[in-house]
A protein has these predicted regions:
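Short beta->alpha junction loops
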Residues: 99-106
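Glycine-rich, Arg-bearing micro-motifs that act as flexible, cationic patches
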Residues: 1-10, 126-149, 162
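Short acidic active-site motifs
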Residues: 7, 81, 107-113, 142
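A structural signal for isolated positions on well-ordered beta-strands in alpha/beta enzyme cores
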Residues: 38, 64-68, 99, 155
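Redox- and metal-dependent alpha/beta enzyme cores, enriched for Fe-S-associated oxidoreductases
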Residues: 45-93
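Short secondary-structure boundary segments
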Residues: 24, 69, 127-129, 158-159
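Active-site charged/polar residues at nucleotide-handling catalytic sites that mediate phosphoryl
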Residues: 119
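Intrinsically disordered or low-complexity boundary/linker segments at protein termini
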Residues: 3-4, 8-53, 148-162
Length: 162
């Protein structure tokens, strides 16, 4: 599984098109099965562009989206920013159900896993900014665990430079 994980991580890091990484034993067959998609944001402008791309590419499917920000501390400003992003996209896509949450980043893998389970998330989505996709959002070891030791598919969208 390590070799497969390494190859998948390399594909994700080098790709300039969206990549859907599906863990080996995940019973995921098609996008129409996905009812809840989580989108991790770091409040970067490229996240908003990637979110727009996600919605436009999947507009023929029926699903809801949870905007997630990972934070070490409880910060009201993060909630305000997420609420603003939700409001902006709710106007752009009135038919789309959008939620938002700040996930405490004290134990990333455990926190995300708990969030995924309690919110019935079918796909985790994040934006890659540079060649090294995980350097800004995650500790590489945790990211590898998240991708390859999770049953949740991961959709990575390349964030075009501003």
């Amino acid at each position: 599984i390590d070799l497969i994980g390494s190859v998948t991580a390399e594909v994700i890091e080098r790709s300039r098109v969206p990549v859907l990484a599906i863990p080996e034993n995940t019973p995921f067959k098609q996008f129409s099965e996905a009812k809840r998609i989580a989108f991790i944001t770091n409040f970067d402008q490229r996240d908003l562009i990637a979110f727009d791309s996600l919605i436009n590419n999947l507009k023929s499917f029926k699903f809801s989206v949870s905007l997630i920000h990972l934070s070490d501390v409880q910060n009201t400003w993060n909630e305000i920013k997420l609420a603003g992003i939700k409001e902006y996209f709710q106007k752009q896509y009135p038919q789309l159900e959008i939620y938002y949450d700040v996930v405490k980043n004290d134990n990333l893998l455990s926190s995300l896993d708990s969030y995924i389970k309690s919110n019935h998330i079918d796909i985790m989505t994040l934006t890659s900014y540079k060649r090294n996709i995980f350097s800004r959002l995650f500790n590489p070891g945790i990211a590898r665990k998240m991708i390859f030791h999770s049953d949740t598919p991961l959709l990575v969208i390349y964030g075009r430079p501003n």
